[in-house]
Amino acid sequence: MERKEVIVSEQELARQKEFTRKMREMNDRRTRTPLALVDTFGCQQNVADGEVLMGMLREMGYELTRDENQADVILLNTCAIREHAEKRVYGHLGRLSHTKAAKPDQIICLCGCMAQQKVVADKVKNSYHHVDLVLGPQAEWRLPELLHEVYTKNKRVFSIENEHGRIAEDLPIVREGGVRAWVSIMYGCNNFCSYCIVPYVRGRERSREPEKIIEECRGLIAEGYKEITLLGQNVNSYGKDLGTDYDFADLLAAINAIPGDYWLRFMSSQPKDATNKLFDTMARCEHVAKQLHLPVQSGCDRVLKAMNRPYTRAKYEEMIAYARSVMPGMVLTSDVIIGFPGETEDEAMQTVDLVEKTQFDALFTFIFSPRPGTPAAKMDDPVSREEKQVWFEKLVDAQNAISAKKHAAYIGRTVKVLVDGESDDEAFPLAARTEGNRLVRMKGDKALIGTFAKAKITDSNTWALYGEVVEE
């Protein structure tokens, strides 16, 4: 696609502003301020999308609420990565039929990745008659127009156009907390891993202009945000569609040059596009957290090929060795799928072997979940769920032992942390994160929330560190 076809035009955005104005006028005529609720499921990209949805709703005159019974508009911002997430959404939709029965003028909207799938839209159309609006992630910038259509035409609206996707800039955003910020740098995916639904629901890769991203980050740092996470389905592909040599490492360096007291992170990364240039840039940039999330998915070359992951185990290990050589002490995390169709026990154990040899700090582990419409969903899968569960538990046990050992090594150390909220542990009331994104529950004054602090680590377990604030 030409760049001009990727960017939503000023005229189109102006049209949405006009519908925003009309919605605000309608809401201003109400006897009370209308309430809206956005419930987000899934990944950080969905969280960022949810912040835009909340921003648009607020500009339309809605106040935000968490009370489904009081909300005039409810948006379920959904995830399609795993079957479990979809089941949760359908269960939630079923419960909302009762809130709508008690409040008939309530508008219920399904958006996010689930909504982009025709099979889901058809199911909602035929079985969830209380849902008024369905719009996929590529149409979310048109929320004011579509919501106006629901209200004024008194009909159900479905917008799941199967387009490659575009970029709508300068949309309003509501960020909560004021400490951590998510910044989308690109959208879509071109990789088509055989198990993944994302390219089908998010469209093709399209990068935001670097100037727009840098400007947004500069504003966040000026507002006092202490951590910025750059988001994309594959940030390592950033810039390939810009028509220049400018790449993700260049963007990272440019943001790092902004003065301030902050950490810079990014996710997600595809190993096939990870470069030594990126690792070198991470190493020399003071604000970039020395933490790398690089999903390997499998330790078996045959399975990687079946997954359409174009790298080998040896290549992955080579990348990690280089990254660790230029960033000693780097925190490394990854994703792994166990039980891919056709995978044997020996192949699954190759993944366990990779985990034990690589010594990840943490691992996000999943049993294969078939996604309708993907090649993997059609593959022969003779292994039972029960047998896959046995393999999965061996993987989890191996990683838990590694995580516990790595966390124990922090005991007695004093580390810089970002205090970002309250803990659910009364004995350690503060929740913080290290530069490597390790959770720290600690003792200290709640006035520290939103600031960097020094924490002395006194204890640990598999999942967290424990400590206390110390004076610098």
Placement of each model-derived feature along the sequence:
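Glycine-centered loop/turn positions within well-structured domains
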Residues: 141, 191, 236, 301-302, ...
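Short flexible coil/turn linkers enriched for glycine and charged/polar residues
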Residues: 176-179, 189-191, 288, 298, ...
